Amino acid sequence: MISKSLKGKIVWITGGKRIGQEIAVGLAQLGADLVLSYRRSEKEAQDTAKKAKKLGRKVSVIKCDTADSEGVQKAVNEIKKEFKKLDILVLLASIFKPVSLEKIMEGDWDSNFSVHVKGTFWPIQLSLPLMKPGSHIIAVSDRTAIGRMYPGYLPYIVTKSSVAAMTKAMAIELGPKGIFINSIAPGPVLKPDDISEKEWQKIRAESFIKYPITDKETVQEFVDTVIRLCFVRSSGGIYPLDFGHL
């Protein structure tokens, strides 16, 4: 764990359950006050908020579909009203559903594009008025954006690769504003609810052949990487998190 302080910093995390909960608690332990937004998982977001509040942090929970520009603007307005600023934006909203090439439908493209591309773009663009020089944006791409592919996830891979491209392109425009943007490119971290345990173990085995590790170790490394990126003074980076298996 990095021994630095985020006291006085306001962090917006899109997605307050699963890995989002671990990240929120990790940032709260360093002193950050939090904004947790959710689309459907209110209970999980509230549970995360309770954990952060027990650490003495101020937490706001907001319902927000990050793919909807109007909804994102409302969330930004609430953040401005309550906190006046935003120091760190962590973009975690994601879907991970298998679909073979022959069975891809228009809806598969639409859902992946909405969540990964629009759901990354709108919070960044609309939050900029609240962000001062020295602020940080942390997006989540995928290891396939910079390394080996795996079958059965084409819409996911294409749209997550777009997040990596967006990160590098935005870094050029945000540089003069003094705002840093970087992306994490992880392998599989936590099993999605709609994937069987057998399929999940197959995905993990293919991803971590060189370094067999537990889900707990993977999650902690993800949390630690997010924390590190809250302090870096570089921008446009794509940080692999796959334990060397590119």
How would you label these PLM feature ranges?
Residues 130, 218-242:
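C-terminal substrate-recognition "lid" of short-chain dehydrogenase/reductases
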Residues 100-101, 108-113, 203, 207:
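Substrate-binding pocket helix/loop in short-chain dehydrogenase/reductase
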Residues 4-35:
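Canonical Rossmann dinucleotide-binding motif of NAD(H)/NADP(H)-dependent dehydrogenases/reductases
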Residues 138-162, 167-176, 188-189:
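Catalytic loop of short-chain dehydrogenase/reductase
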Residues 124-125, 168:
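A short, exposed helix-loop element centered on a Lys and neighboring polar residues
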Residues 176, 183-211:
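A glycine/serine/threonine-rich, flexible loop-to-helix segment
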Residues 27, 87, 164, 174-189, ...:
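Conserved Rossmann-fold SDR core element
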